[in-house]
């Protein structure tokens, strides 16, 4: 441990201890039960998601010194059931010349009992006239390994700016690694000097020495940056996920600042391929930078940052409590009738206690953490009102999530309206936590996620002839 690492360890420990003492004394109103949060400060992208020897690992972008962001390091949680998580502290600090301005996002690759963590080491040069897009930034690809997810070896710098194609800006980041046959592949997000987003493929025979292989591009320019790329196959469907910055036009005018979605891949992504139109993973307010991994039982598990970068429209009142943001609840990605769908991981079933099983209408108060299922919806009639201010409803093929008040001091904290054209409405699942709501429409073909900040907890559901259940989450 070098002197910088030692000092960072002490500073982080002090910040976390002070936050714990503060919350023990005064409490915190909106801490979640099901969703991972930072102990103190700021959380953003999920990193290094994996399951090794029965234990799930979730690393996260962590800025413990400021609830509105700052220098990034990797915090670390573990779990055996994807619900009850144990905080393991900071695993990776920005303590080397090649990552001194942030241990940025990356992924985990497992092989032969070893966890290989690949990430982007961020360096911002000083004392120069830099725009930090084309000049002044280093985006270094770094590797660190561990046998147990707790004790880590030395960092290795694998790729520098000079190893990337010359027509790119300094924005190359977020490595994700997989293996096919005897070759290892790495995908990274990139921005060209012409402000076109794309993904890069690198290949290696040993997980250490990497060489540029090819690009992944849409037929027409699509945004200026593809962040947090992820490639996987599930049920025979090939999926390229990316968080895209810079989408403009009428189609995106009512959406978030940046989008997170996926392309279906026809062909071989390493050779000849065609990308489908872009589909959003989530149509709500708070969703960005998703990553996935394959669990030991073969399920594809998907987790996202339940937040939105560079958003001035809305905020989170937990900032005054010394922390901000959380992850989405882990989701299973599956294919139904050729469509990509999502649902909460099945481990949640063991935590449910059914309180109501009714027809037509449901009212429940005083329970902040719950799941509501509405099945057998007839003639598309559906409305749910949460804490009097968050409304979910359907009309003429459009499903909406909207708040009655947009004020930053209200339940919405500034959020207004999000929607999707869903066609016929068949069923709705609502998963609510202390300060978040995730809504799964038509078996999870469409999903809406939002933070919300009620003083009292109540839900009223109206759907004539539908079957409605309310389960308290223990």
Functional labels for PLM-detected ranges:
Residues 1-174, 179-222, 235-283, 306-355, ...:
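Beta-rich carbohydrate-recognition and catalytic domains
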Residues 226-229, 288-290:
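Repeated scaffold domains used in trafficking and secretory/extracellular systems
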Residues 16-22, 258-474:
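Beta-rich accessory regions
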